[in-house]
A protein has these predicted regions:
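Active-site mouth loops of central-metabolism enzymes
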Residues: 61-76, 119-127, 170-172, 220-225
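Catalytic cores of alpha/beta
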Residues: 127-139, 174-186, 221-244
Length: 269
């Protein structure tokens, strides 16, 4: 199987350059200013982890994954997002990459437009500052930076710019070798349980990395979390949040599936 990250990087290096030809950065910034996005407040992603001992579920609106292919090509954020909010999601994660996740920036924009009050996590393979302006324009509360895709200096620079634009930063780690990236100043740490170069999953990665992370950092885990028992084990290991998408999206009613999952977490707890 071709190295997933190699394919991602090859695609992403082209994508921002194409967007810049269509809407140059100066023009995009002008649109952001004109629409008042710089002054418009967004709910804090970090704050959802305050004041509760129960692990929080960030529900993901995802129509496609590299591992599963298309899950639901016709899924609508206006339906799923509202149901997620109704059934207890702490925040909503929205992958905006089309090639690998079938996503668009418009999903984030629509979630804002229909009045979803939860923080929105803009997930993409961000390697260029242009993408941060796209996230701001869309209405994101927070963005994900992936350590393995960036140099330490790139990560610091993108983190600083995201903060200037009023967005929080979630730093995604795959291995202990990336712990140097804590120096970037991200607001939260996301441990991805997938092996970076394959589809293999190992939730024990989160537990191992949790022991190496500072006690006061907010820790979120994603990938392979398919039972409330696993969710509570992660909580015991020091995680305050989990991101779950395809488990819910594969069901006829993702919101109800989320609600049942949260109920079971509390029972197990």
């Amino acid at each position: 199987m071709k190295d997933i990250l190699e394919a991602v990087v090859a695609n992403k290096q082209k994508e921002p350059e194409l967007w810049k030809q269509y809407v140059p950065l100066k023009q995009l910034y002008g649109i952001i200013e004109y629409e008042g996005a710089l002054e418009r407040g967004v709910p804090s992603f970090k704050s959802v982890f305050n004041g509760s001992s129960t692990i929080k579920v960030i529900a993901e609106f995802v129509r496609k994954t590299p591992a599963w292919g298309w899950i639901d090509k016709e899924a609508k954020i206006r339906n799923v997002g509202v149901d997620y909010e109704k059934h207890g999601a702490a925040a909503i994660s929205i992958p905006t990459d089309f090639v690998y996740f079938g996503g668009y920036d418009e999903f984030v924009q629509e979630a804002c437009a229909i009045g979803i009050a939860l923080p929105l996590l803009y997930k993409n393979y961000i390697i260029d500052e242009y993408q941060l302006f796209q996230a701001k324009h869309a209405g994101a509360s927070a963005i994900v930076l992936t350590a393995v895709l960036l140099s330490l200096e790139q990560c610091k620079s993108l983190t600083s710019l995201a903060h200037q634009l009023g967005m929080e930063v979630v730093l995604k780690l795959y291995t202990a070798e990336e712990l140097d990236y804590l120096a970037c100043g991200a607001d939260l740490i996301l441990v991805n349980n997938r092996m970076p170069h394959s589809f293999d999953m190992d939730v024990s990665k989160s537990v191992e990395l949790a022991n190496l992370l500072p006690a006061d950092v907010i820790k979120v885990s994603e990938g392979g979390i398919d039972t409330p028992v696993i969710a509570n084990k992660l909580a015991e290991a020091g995680f305050q949040g989990i991101i779950i998408g395809d488990l819910f999206m594969k069901t006829p009613n993702p919101g109800s599936a989320l609600g049942e999952f949260i109920k079971e977490i509390r029972k197990e707890n």
